[in-house]
Amino acid sequence: MRAEYQFVDRWFVPGARIEDVYDVIGEQLEYPKWWGDVFLAVTGDEGPPRPGRRASILSRGFLPYKLRWSSEIVEAQRPRGFRMTVSGDFVGGGEWTLEEVDGGGSATLDWRPVVEKPFVKQLTPVLRPLFRVNHVWAMRRGQEGIVEYMRRRGGEPQ
């Protein structure tokens, strides 16, 4: 059985311009600074999203296992969003879409991974709800982290 998942998560960053949110979300090498509960290590190409930019990632949720995966940007349109493919413990892809909303910036991740980590793949038929909660936990850490990071670096208007 394939361990296919589909998640759509939306973050709101109060007072932030989407250009600033895009720049933060787009620089994966910086994720451990503001999303460190989830992104333990990220190595790869520096700079903004662009086709061909790659990153190697070690991540985790609240469950006691880690995931090793790589991402490659396949399309980028600053500040509207970017699309990526992934391989490793995750296969598939995702797309970040950003938009201005009243009072700040909104970032939506449409994430469609197939999990290839053997034990997760084997246990998905029974533990899918728990793995979904693990994803929700990870995304909540990201939402909290980016809001605080943007506040600290002055991403809110004066």
Tell what function each PLM region has:
Residues 1-50, 156-158:
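Hydrophobic ligand-binding cavity/cleft-lining segments
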Residues 9-11, 44, 69-75, 93-100, ...:
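Hydrophobic/aromatic beta-strand elements that line small-molecule binding cavities or substrate pockets
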Residues 12-15, 58-62, 99-101, 112-116:
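Solvent-exposed residues in well-ordered beta-strands and their adjoining turns
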Residues 17, 27-30, 78, 103, ...:
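Amphipathic alpha-helical protein-protein interaction surfaces
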Residues 42-90, 106, 140-158:
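Glycine-rich portal/gate segments that line the openings of hydrophobic small-molecule binding cavities
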Residues 85-140, 157:
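Beta-strand/loop substructures that line and gate deep hydrophobic ligand-binding cavities in soluble
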